[in-house]
Swiss-Prot record:
Isopentenyl diphosphate binds at H43, H81, H131, S226, N228, S271. One of its GO terms (molecular function) is 4-hydroxy-3-methylbut-2-enyl diphosphate reductase activity. This is 4-hydroxy-3-methylbut-2-enyl diphosphate reductase. The lineage of its organism: Bacteria, Bacillati, Bacillota, Bacilli, Bacillales. Keywords: 4Fe-4S, Iron, Iron-sulfur, Isoprene biosynthesis, Metal-binding, Oxidoreductase. Belongs to the IspH family. Its EC number is 1.17.7.4. Dimethylallyl diphosphate binds at H43, H81, H131, S226, N228, S271. It comes from the Bacteria. Gene3D superfamilies: 3.40.50.11270, 4-hydroxy-3-methylbut-2-enyl diphosphate reductase, catalytic domain. The active site is at E133 (proton donor). The gene is ispH.
Length: 314
């Protein structure tokens, strides 16, 4: 079957940096044990499973602060999504060693909220409720930040302030953010806009918006918890008009999706391991509806091939 390898796709620099830091931590025998990750280092189960094989424990919970309360000793890794100042404070009070893998793009948003809230600004923050990135950003100045996920949330806002900044989670759909920000500006014309969609998210979405038009179907390889992966599928359907499915790996492909399809576009979320995506591409390229031997997807990528190679610090 014909495959369009939508490019750019896959890992962004923030994800790679986070995984390298976590892997260096796993191999650094000087760091106190056990080593924990507060949440998923990046939103991909294959990656977290691979780290567990290296002895790193991924902790889950309703929020980062509650997760950290489970930890009494050792080392904690802050994920690429960032954490609130309250989490940093508690880690320090507990005497824990901290490895900070926060994406620099996320840190920039935290700095904006910290600096401008001290000047009396209120914030309208466009983000996904329940996602760790907004949790960390809002935690910088919770009394100044209002989280909105859609236009309806904007309509229900009641902010009395002359100084307002509208900003956003880095991995949102740029089209959704634009629509929500437009509505917010109509309601609060005095507001300033600081669009914080990261470049990696933006160019991957634009690639899908353009290249998916050439395809009958688009497959997005990414974890269900990965917001940027889910947004890529949304962009394919809503902007390019091409049906899309998000899958975790090759085993989730369904044969009926390919009925009447000649060209399949494949892209991947920013936290999706490259070998997982390559396996999906290879399967679809070999798939032939007239040859039953090509119909059964099988995952052969081992966890050992998931994580980036790192130099052991001596």
């Amino acid at each position: 079957m014909n495959v369009v390898k939508i490019s750019p796709r896959g890992y962004c620099y923030g994800v790679v940096d986070a995984m390298v830091l976590a892997r260096q931590a796993a191999q650094n025998l000087d760091l106190p044990r056990p080593i924990y990750i507060l949440g998923m280092i990046v939103h991909n189960k294959h990656v977290t499973d691979a780290f567990e094989e290296e002895g790193i424990i991924s902790l889950d919970g309703p929020n980062r602060l509650d997760i950290l309360k489970q930890v009494d000793k050792g080392t904690v890794i802050f994920t690429a999504h960032g954490v609130s100042p309250q989490v940093r404070k508690l880690a320090k009070e507990k005497g824990l060693t901290v490895v900070d893998a926060t994406c620099p793009d996320v840190t920039r948003t935290h700095d904006l909220i910290r600096e401008k809230s001290q000047e009396g600004y209120k914030f309208i923050y466009v983000g996904k409720k329940g996602h760790p990135e907004p949790e960390g950003a809002i935690g910088v100045a919770p009394e100044f930040v209002h989280l909105v996920e859609n236009v309806e949330d904007v309509e229900s806002l009641d902010i009395s302030a002359d100084k307002i900044i509208i900003t956003n989670q880095t991995t949102m759909s740029q089209w959704d953010v634009s629509e929500i920000m437009k509505k917010a500006m109509e309601k609060y014309p005095q507001a300033e806009v600081h669009n914080e969609i990261c470049l990696a998210t933006q160019v991957r979405q634009e690639a899908v918006a353009e290249q998916a038009r050439e395809c009958d179907l688009v497959i997005v390889v990414g974890d269900p918890k990965s917001n940027n992966s889910n947004r890529l599928a949304q962009v394919s359907e809503q902007i390019a008009g091409t049906k899309a499915y998000r899958i975790g790996d090759v085993t989730e492909l369904q044969q009926e999706w390919f009925d009447g399809v000649e060209t399949v576009g494949v892209t991947a979320g920013a936290s999706t391991p490259t070998p997982i995506t390559k396996e999906v591409i290879a399967f679809i390229e070999k798939y032939d509806p007239s040859k039953p031997e090509t119909w059964t997807p099988e995952r052969k990528v081992t966890l050992q091939k998931i994580l980036p190679k790192v130099k052991i610090k001596k």
